[in-house]
Amino acid sequence: MASADSRRVADGGGAGGTFQPYLDTLRQELQQTDPTLLSVVVAVLAVLLTLVFWKLIRSRRSSQRAVLLVGLCDSGKTLLFVRLLTGLYRDTQTSITDSCAVYRVNNNRGNSLTLIDLPGHESLRLQFLERFKSSARAIVFVVDSAAFQREVKDVAEFLYQVLIDSMGLKNTPSFLIACNKQDIAMAKSAKLIQQQLEKELNTLRVTRSAAPSTLDSSSTAPAQLGKKGKEFEFSQLPLKVEFLECSAKGGRGDVGSADIQDLEKWLAKIA
């Protein structure tokens, strides 16, 4: 037994001894190599590693193909969902579950997205948002522009939570606030809706920060919405929030075409 061990040591430790000549040769080659050439090789390797890392990030991003349509009940998101997929008008009703379908975007790359229409009912919307948010490439928050004045507090409450959740994701989604029902005479403009939402969200974050903290020290503090000590603006967020106007129903009612061209362009841009 002892003689066998002695032979193993003499041979260079088995498998290690087999590769030792190659390692010695490599070491000698590196020592004899021109330092300039060695620097070039190291630089090329660094570039290759960077490209591999970038490709991994891109593939992770490309695997997120979901676009979440969220909003209050009767905001018109389900009709938007139908219009994007079929171009046709259809009577819709409040749903208690999600609907999803593949959407081919209108660009020269032939990309596709998965549209997911989430329920707008107060008791369900956060539950479904939690289920799908990690797969979101983009979030389209649909607002009823005609009913906005009376719903502004409810809209801001839900939007506050959606923004906080989006900021906490590893891959921050693209974010759009679609001001729907612009065909109605009393509809508010996207600019006015943005201004009023900024005021409401500013009030909300003040009241939320003043609320007593939990006794559970293990719980993490919620993300800060905007810059502390300044009036809230969407431009302060780490994600870009865009606004546009649209009309899922269209100016001619049930028989007319929808005014969603800007929304289609936005989806093509983020696909």
Curated annotation (Swiss-Prot):
One of its GO terms (biological process) is protein targeting to ER. GO terms for molecular function: GTP binding. Keywords: Endoplasmic reticulum, GTP-binding, Membrane, Nucleotide-binding, Phosphoprotein, Receptor, Transmembrane, Transmembrane helix. The chain crosses the membrane at residues 37-57. It is a single-pass membrane protein. It is found in: Endoplasmic reticulum membrane. SUPFAM superfamilies: P-loop containing nucleoside triphosphate hydrolases (SSF52540). The modification Phosphothreonine is found at residue 214. GTP binds at residues 71-79, 92-95, 120, 248. Coiled coil: none annotated. InterPro entries: P-loop_NTPase, Small_GTPase_ARF, SRP_receptor_beta_su. The keyword Disulfide bond does not apply. Its main location: endoplasmic reticulum. This is Signal recognition particle receptor subunit beta.
